[in-house]
């Protein structure tokens, strides 16, 4: 399916481009996913597709139409690649739940649902985590970071410009850092050591600080408020 793209800001920049979309089934057994893209967002939906892997992509380009697949499989790892100069590829992938995800994208939002361990970076774009079952380490230079239903053994979230909002479902240590934006965390009841730093903003901390607590909440922003509370349980 092919369509002319509209004028405006796209992942390729400010230009009129052409866009096409396609779908591909991945027959190989996939044990992990690695992001290796330039411009374009990535959405991974774990637990979809009945255990199979399906790759949907939307490619916006200027000049000659890019040919061939932009994803590949290396030793069981699904690698989501880019499409070259003046081109952006946006992925939506359905895959089994619990697969680890790593890698980076230069420019684009990253949305991960029901995956395993996460270690990803985007140069510019929001990062959204939902139902992550492993340790999560995420970084963006310009974008908001949100995470809900996180059940791993630790969270590290860093952004230079954006808010951070995290709600884990299991007690774990959290390190959240932003240069410009508010930080909000809501954690299950557990013993926490609480460290907060802000140069310009209010603090609303209702999580009890226990110096010998097993878990550590380390929250830092240069410009923004910090809120740390406990999730209400019935």
Functional labels for PLM-detected ranges:
Residues 147-234:
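Short, surface-exposed interaction patches in beta-rich subdomains
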Residues 30, 115, 132-133, 152, ...:
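A broad structural signal for short, well-ordered beta-strand segments within beta-sheet-rich domains
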Residues 33-36, 103, 120, 138, ...:
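Active-site alpha-helical segments that house and flank conserved acidic catalytic motifs
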């Amino acid at each position: 399916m092919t369509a002319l793209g509209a004028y405006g800001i796209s992942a390729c920049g400010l230009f009129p481009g052409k866009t096409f979309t396609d779908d591909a089934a991945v027959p190989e057994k996939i044990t992990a996913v690695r992001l290796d893209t330039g411009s374009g967002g990535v959405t991974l939906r774990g637990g979809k597709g009945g255990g199979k892997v399906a790759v949907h992509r939307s490619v916006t380009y200027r000049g000659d139409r890019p040919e061939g697949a932009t994803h590949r499989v290396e030793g069981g790892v699904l690698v989501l690649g880019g499409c070259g100069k003046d081109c952006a590829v946006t992925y939506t992938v359905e895959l089994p739940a619990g697969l680890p995800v790593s890698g980076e994208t230069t420019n684009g939002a990253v949305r991960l649902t029901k995956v395993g361990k996460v270690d990803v970076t985007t140069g510019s774009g929001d990062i959204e985590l939902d139902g992550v079952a492993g340790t999560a380490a995420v970084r963006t230079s310009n974008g908001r970071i949100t995470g809900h239903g996180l059940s791993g053994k630790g969270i590290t979230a860093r952004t230079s410009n954006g808010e951070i909002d995290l709600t884990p479902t299991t007690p774990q240590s959290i390190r959240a850092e932003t240069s410009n934006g508010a930080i909000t965390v809501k954690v299950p009841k557990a013993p926490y050591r609480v460290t907060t730093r802000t140069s310009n903003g209010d603090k609303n901390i209702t999580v009890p600080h226990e110096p010998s607590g097993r878990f550590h909440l380390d929250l830092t922003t240069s410009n923004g408020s910090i809120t740390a509370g406990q999730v209400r349980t019935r």
